[in-house]
Regions:
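Conserved inter-motif catalytic segment of the P-loop NTP-binding fold
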Residues: 34-129
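Hydrophobic/aromatic beta-strand patches that form the interior of the parallel beta-sheet core
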Residues: 5-7, 40-42, 79-81, 155, ...
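Phosphate-binding/switch region of NTP-binding enzymes
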Residues: 131-137, 141, 145-253
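Conserved RecA-like P-loop NTPase ATPase core
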Residues: 7, 53, 78, 111, ...
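Conserved, well-folded catalytic cores of nucleic-acid-processing
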Residues: 10, 25-33, 56-63, 96-103, ...
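The Walker A/P-loop phosphate-binding site
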Residues: 1-66, 70, 258, 262
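Conserved beta-strand elements of beta-rich interaction domains across eukaryotes
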Residues: 12, 46, 85-86, 114-115, ...
Length: 263
């Protein structure tokens, strides 16, 4: 509670699926592990699926969502807000305090943080980098303030980028992932990584298996566990979690599909 958690990883690993599952969970009563509240789902990629939300709810808690009325009541507790520009998103974040109070929001999701930033600040020009840094810093400050003020969780998703060599890592340079050298890591650089309390990295082990890593956390050890995406959401495999040697979360390497030249 009261923290900002980032879920980062390559396309297709289940970041939005994770967010949809958490949305359902937050609407559940507290005795069922929920927050018994409403969810604000800020969608910047038009990735939210109402059909998937209903499927997860029915599969996860069929006793609570067995009728059309029960499903409708649950769906109405997930408030979806679409934003296509950085300025629009920032204006939304600046009014979050009022919305949390008015709509009894108990979970805020931003899916995704990176998409608008990378679209509007794609150039490496110095002025662009300054504007990007200022926008990300302002965005992070607003989200952290809301999380702490109301003691509610804030979830943000992030994408991946490719870094080339030691100099690129030191300077936080981001280059397109289709290049054939370098390594894949979380987008938006080290400055942004310092603004999140917890970082979960989703990655591919192979074409079929996926893994989530706790890359940064104030309370949890560096752990990783395999998972699959099923009708009721993200499901941990039976073998359980494994401890791994942690590294700087800002340069944690990420495994993508084996068809890509990274491993």
């Amino acid at each position: 509670m009261g923290t900002v958690t980032e879920i980062a990883g390559p396309s297709g690993c289940g970041k939005t699926q994770f967010c949809i599952m958490l949305s359902v969970q937050a609407t559940l009563p507290r005795h069922r592990g929920g927050l018994d509240g409403n969810v604000l789902f800020i969608d910047t990629e038009s990735a939210f699926s109402a059909e998937r939300l209903l499927e997860v709810a029915q599969s996860k808690c069929p006793d609570l969502h067995s009728t059309e009325e029960e499903l409708c009541n649950m769906a109405q507790r997930v408030l979806v807000d679409n934003h296509q520009t950085c300025s629009s998103l920032l204006k939304k974040l600046e009014t979050l305090e009022e919305e949390v109070i008015t709509h009894k929001i108990r979970l805020i999701i931003v899916d995704s943080i990176a998409s608008l930033v990378r679209k509007e600040f794609s150039s490496s020009a110095g002025s662009n980098l300054i504007h990007r840094t200022n926008f990300l810093s302002r965005q992070a400050a607003l989200l952290k303030n809301i999380a702490e003020l109301f003691s509610i969780p804030v979830i943000v998703t992030n994408q991946i980028t490719t870094r080339f060599g030691r100099q690129a890592a030191e300077q936080d340079e981001e280059l397109p992932t289709e290049f054939s050298e370098g390594y894949v890591t979380v987008a938006l650089g080290n400055t942004w990584s310092h603004n999140v309390n917890t970082r979960l990295i989703l990655q591919y082990l192979n074409d079929d298996k996926r893994q989530v890593m706790v890359a940064k956390s104030p309370v949890a050890p560096f752990t990783a566990f395999n998972y699959t995406i099923q009708k009721d959401g993200i499901i941990q495999d039976a073998e359980g979690a494994a401890v791994y040697a942690g590294t700087d979360p800002g340069v944690q390497q990420i495994s993508v599909r084996s068809s890509l030249p990274f491993h």
